[in-house]
Curated annotation (Swiss-Prot):
Pfam families: ChlI, Mg_chelatase, Mg_chelatase_C. GO terms for molecular function: ATP binding; ATP hydrolysis activity. It comes from Mycobacterium tuberculosis (strain ATCC 25618 / H37Rv). SMART domains: AAA. This is Uncharacterized protein Rv2897c. Belongs to the Mg-chelatase subunits D/I family. ComM subfamily. InterPro entries: AAA+_ATPase (IPR003593), CHLI-like (IPR045006), Mg_chelat-rel (IPR004482), Mg_chelat-rel_C (IPR025158), Mg_chelatse_chII-like_cat_dom (IPR000523), P-loop_NTPase (IPR027417), Ribosomal_Su5_D2-typ_SF (IPR020568), Ribsml_uS5_D2-typ_fold_subgr (IPR014721). Was identified as a high-confidence drug target. One of its GO terms (cellular component) is plasma membrane.
Length: 503
């Protein structure tokens, strides 16, 4: 009887759990038996591992081979366990165990000739290894830049199974940590490219200052998409912990770039209007993968032609908008992904959407039904609503509007003021502040609250609408450099909740 052991990581959502892999060689009919809740891809690893081991010049045990993955109750999915399985088999055939194998986590898929292929989810796996106190992790060489983002743990890159075997014996070394660029390239989109639309430009600035949700309505070609694409450029760069969190989500989704794996700027995600519920919030067979709402975490989720999106997909946005996370239950377990994003909706006023509203041929009932797909509870969560109109010839002037860098400076000052004010209460932006805190400890003056009381008495606002209006009023005050919102800021914030209102 011979026993070998290796270790790997199972990633569920953004959490990783250490998996112990044991290889037991006993007398009996030759065959490979894999136990421990493996999925189809892991079942196929028996053939990949056997071919890789033999093609690297090693013998395969002609006896009964049992491969056990523990804990047995945890579902194991994917090909990330290949090199750990191969190392356990090779260790079982050795007379003397490899000391390095007991202190190293192994991640990677094997090809038939022994090459190590890249896998998804390396960053959350390495973070889990560091959390549990493991001294070293070996990853595919193509994933080494991603693994090198985690400090405080020894990361190594391997290209072939033979190279890994030599390193375990202590005869050769493996590639070490790689230093990569720590910045994401700036977007070339500039706010100065947008012609006219001063009201909508100001709404985008307010949205950036307070992390508010925004809805733009208007005919085609007025600049709704251009404005939405320029919102991420106004937002501050991600902090170190935020960068790792966002990068981990994109790692699980398989969307990381090999050259600049660390995401330092807020992401911009724009799914197609025909996207399904699973594409928006996440899903898939086996363990659920992150959807658009999670990929937009700490960034902007832009839903163009939102009136064309299915009702079920729109209603699925309610939970992440309120909770800042999405929990996806599947047969193999529950995956939880963060989903705290800024939502930007864009819609035409009607199905025909002419450039001139006077040319519209839609009946009044058709118009109501078209935008009626956006439910009241969903719209109530949108703080800023702007009606955009087609430009006249006078809007084309030689002078450009303010650039992204100019507006970003004002946004940064407003965000810093908000962060200092809310830091003792555990918040950073105005959009995150709870309603009771706004209405009790940070309530504006009685005169400033007059427009809100009037709207509430007339049934134009819900209590949630009052809270969201106050949040926008605080953002307007921060942009103006004031210590508290006055009646002008409250009235302006209230006007942003009324479709067609002007600044």
């Amino acid at each position: 009887m011979a026993l070998g052991r290796a270790f790997s990581v199972a990633v569920r959502g953004l959490d990783g759990e250490i998996v112990e892999i044991e290889a037991d060689i006993t007398s009996g009919l030759p065959g490979v038996h894999l136990v421990g809740l493996p999925d189809a891809a892991l079942q196929e690893s028996r053939d990949r591992v056997r071919a890789a081991v033999t093609n690297c010049g090693n013998s395969w045990p002609m006896a009964r081979l049992t491969l056990a993955l523990s804990p047995a109750t945890l579902p194991k999915m994917g090909s990330v366990y290949d090199i750990a399985l191969a190392a356990a088999v090779l260790s079982a055939q050795q007379k003397k165990p490899w000391e390095r194998l007991e202190n190293t986590l192994l991640l990677g898929e094997l090809s038939l000739d022994g090459r190590v292929r890249p896998v998804r989810g390396v960053l959350p796996a390495v973070l889990a290894a560091k959390r549990d106190g493991w001294p070293a992790v070996v990853v595919p060489a193509d994933n080494l830049p991603e693994a090198s983002l985690v400090d405080g743990i020894d990361v190594r890159g391997v290209r072939t199974l033979g190279q890994l075997q030599s390193w375990l014996r202590g005869s050769t070394g493996l590639a070490g940590r790689i230093t990569t660029a720590d910045t994401t390239p700036e977007s070339a989109a500039d706010l100065a490219d947008v012609v006219g639309q001063s009201q909508a430009r100001f709404a985008v600035e307010v949205a950036a200052a307070g992390a508010h949700h925004l809805m733009l309505t208007g005919p085609p070609g007025v600049g709704k998409t251009m404005l939405a694409q320029r919102l991420p450029g106004l937002l501050p760069s991600l902090s170190g912990s935020e960068s790792l969190e966002v990068t981990a989500i994109h790692s699980v989704a398989g969307l990381l770039s090999g050259d600049t794996p660390l995401i330092t700027r807020p992401p911009f995600v724009a799914p197609h209007h025909s996207s399904s519920v699973a594409a928006l919030v996440g899903g898939g067979s086996g363990m659920a993968r992150p959807g658009a709402v999670s990929r937009a975490h700490r960034g902007v989720l832009f839903l163009d032609e939102c009136a064309e999106i299915s009702l079920s997909a729109l209603e699925a946005l309610r939970t992440p908008l309120e909770d800042g996370e999405i929990r996806l239950a599947r047969r193999d377990g529950v995956a939880c992904y963060p989903a705290r994003f800024q939502l930007v909706l864009a819609a035409n006023p009607c199905p025909c959407a002419p450039a001139d509203p006077q040319d519209c041929i839609c009946a009044a009932a058709t118009k109501r039904r078209y935008l009626g797909k956006l439910s009241g509870p969903l719209l109530d969560r949108v703080d800023l609503r702007v009606q955009m109109h087609r430009l006249r010839a006078g809007a084309f002037s030689a002078a450009d509007g303010e650039s992204t860098s100019q507006v970003r400076q004002r946004v940064a000052l407003a965000r810093e003021a908000a962060a200092q004010r809310w830091r003792p209460h555990g918040f950073r932006t105005n959009a995150e502040v709870s309603g009771p805190l706004l209405r009790r400890k940070f309530r504006p003056s009685s005169a400033a609250m007059l427009p809100l009381r009037t709207a509430l008495d007339r049934g134009l606002l819900s209590i949630r609408g009052v809270d969201r209006t106050l949040r926008v009023a605080w953002s307007l005050a921060d942009l103006a450099g004031r210590t508290s919102p006055g009646i002008d800021e409250v009235a302006a914030a209230l006007s942003f909740r009324q479709t067609g209102a002007r600044r």
